[in-house]
Amino acid sequence: MLKRHAVKIGLSLLMCLALPAPPSEAHLAKWGTWEITHRNLMKLFQDADPNAWRIKRYSFSEAEVKFLEAQLGFELYPEDKQPEFFIAQDKTGNFLGVAIFIDPRTKPKILDGGILTLEVGIGVNAAGKVNRIKVYDYRGNLELTQDAFLNQLRDRALDSNFTIGKAGLLGVAAEPEESQLVGNAAREALLLMKVALGRRE
């Protein structure tokens, strides 16, 4: 199994368990400070009340950890087992969704002598569907950060197909690996939501 580390996530409340998809090889991203986390939350939920973010902490049980590891194909580090959930609402108090930040690489990639980061923010609504998605501060092909690619992942649920080249998902031609990693991140976000806050039959 692959090892993974560091979690900081935000999830929603309603979800139904889906059929297994190909293992995501993503690991969860952790922003260094609340200021950075808040900045990136607001980029994802631009209509959120900046002063009304709520944080909910969760601890996965041993059974949930085993289920997640089986579905994802890698082991969770201790810090991954106690995620934080960031809940967004607008200025009138309406629920907007939740946010999760995932770094979908298990091995570093070098570009121009520096590490090429790939950090994905995913927003999920109360119906358990992706409704926001953003790639942060990416130094590779910027098509990966644009709506023409990212909007294909909107409205997909855990039982959707996240494989690039199938079910209407078209990757960025110059970055096939990164395109799939972004798709994997969206699927993992929904799975983590399901286990943490949903009902599993």
For the regions a language model picked out, list residue spans one by one.
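Intrinsically disordered terminal and processing segments
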Residues: 2, 8, 16-119, 125-201
